[in-house]
Amino acid sequence: LKSFEKIAQELSGQVSFCVISFLDLYEKTKRNFPEAKEVGKSDQEFLTREFVRIGKQYGIPIRTCCENPDLEKCGADVTGCMTKEVLEQATGCRLQIPQKKKAVRDGCSCLLGSDIGMYNTCQHGCVYCYANYDKKTVAENIRFHDPASPFLIGGFREGDIIKEAKQESYFDAQLRLF
């Protein structure tokens, strides 16, 4: 909390909000970070209240990412971290979101989110990461990196699945007087 307060003090007036999320213990995370523990409900509530208190002190509202909606009672905004409103404020444009737009994952109300990477390719080595199986597999994959390839790692290989990503604009071009 002391570190968060120091960061909040430095960023005061420079950011619109802060997003918090608690560690999810995926199988890969358990394997790579065995000492990690699930953050219990009471600890989540305590930490959220403290983040909100500190955030208020420095003008930084706290939002949660895919967490228990009950954290709203602790003062956090639980509506999502990449909502229509957030994106409109960031871009200065109105958006018209199709009704069929689905959430990225259960409990998520964010509009944007696509996997653009590949498992076992990040070399940062964060022990809580869900995207890497282990360091050895990452090192093996990195050997195939080709800066001239449109692929993140190497080129097309047997068994690769390529998904066409439909890109559509949600920009609302309708002019308004008010």
Model regions and ranges:
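Conserved AdoMet/S-adenosylmethionine-binding subsite of the radical SAM
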Residues: 1-51
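Structured helix-beta-strand junction loops
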Residues: 14, 57-58, 125
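Short, solvent-exposed loop/turn segments at secondary-structure junctions
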Residues: 25, 69-70, 134
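A C-terminal junction/extension of Radical SAM enzymes
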Residues: 31-33, 38-109
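Local cysteine-cluster metal-coordination motifs and their immediate loop/turn environment
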Residues: 106, 114-133
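Short Fe-S-cluster ligation motifs
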Residues: 132-178
